[in-house]
A protein has these predicted regions:
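Residue-level detector of alpha-helix boundaries and kinks
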Residues: 13, 32-33, 87-88
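Polyanionic, low-complexity intrinsically disordered segments
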Residues: 2-23, 27, 94, 110-204
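Hydrophobic core segments within long, regular secondary-structure runs in both alpha-
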Residues: 21, 25-28, 68-71, 100, ...
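Aromatic-acidic/polar surface patches that form glycan- and anion
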Residues: 17, 33-40, 91-92, 96
Length: 204
């Protein structure tokens, strides 16, 4: 692996501290307190993609650059196993992944629409935005996005944005430790590459 540019690594550290923690995470926490539910959920999805720019590739990378960035962070969240299960189930049902439904539709339609096309018919898997995801099982980790049944037993997808913020904060803290304290080469290389993307407009 080539030698890490120390100046760019410092720029990446500054970006993590000033913009990711000081701006993005702080904005999400303020938005949570202000109860701007849909705006908070949208911020979680958009910031997941931005954070992913600074993280190493995962085993199964999408050829779509933006989707790849999203999943580099999304699949590193604390509840990644449940999120991968949900993503696979949605892909199997709709031929599209969660990124294509939730991230795209929240940004462009301001609603987390999940569509399933069957011939000329367009069916919708219900989805809702909620502040909290709560489990009846003590100490269970409730992922930021999950399947749930509504009052009449219909399956829906829930985006629980307090859970999402909590897991993003953990991811950012862990990534900073791996990058700037434990000096893991793949994390440092990705952080430096992320600086080129975000601050210099390079492609990655």
């Amino acid at each position: 692996m080539p030698e890490i540019d120390s100046q760019k690594l410092q720029e990446a550290k500054d970006f993590y501290r000033d913009r990711i923690k000081g701006w993005m995470i702080a904005d999400l926490e303020k938005s949570l307190l202000a109860e701007t539910n849909f705006l908070t959920a949208l911020g979680c999805l958009v910031y997941t993609e931005i954070i992913g720019i600074f993280l190493p590739p995962i085993t199964t990378e999408s050829r779509d650059r933006n989707m790849a960035r999203f999943y580099r962070a999304f699949y590193r969240l604390r509840s990644s196993e449940q999120l991968e299960f949900l993503d696979t189930a949605i892909l199997r049902e709709t031929n599209k992944r969660l990124y294509q439904h939730l991230r795209h539709n929240m940004a462009h339609k301001y609603f987390p629409t999940i569509e399933k096309r069957t011939g000329d018919l367009v069916l919708f898997i219900p989805s809702v935005v909620a502040r909290d995801g709560i489990s009846s099982i003590p100490d269970a980790i409730v992922p930021p996005v999950f399947f749930s049944n509504d009052e009449v037993g219909q399956t829906r997808v829930v985006i629980a944005f307090r859970n999402y913020i909590d897991e993003l904060k953990i991811l950012v803290d862990e990534s900073m430790i791996k990058t700037f304290e434990e000096n893991e080469p793949n994390y440092q290389a990705s952080a430096v590459s992320g600086v080129d993307v975000v601050l210099r407009g390079a492609l990655r």
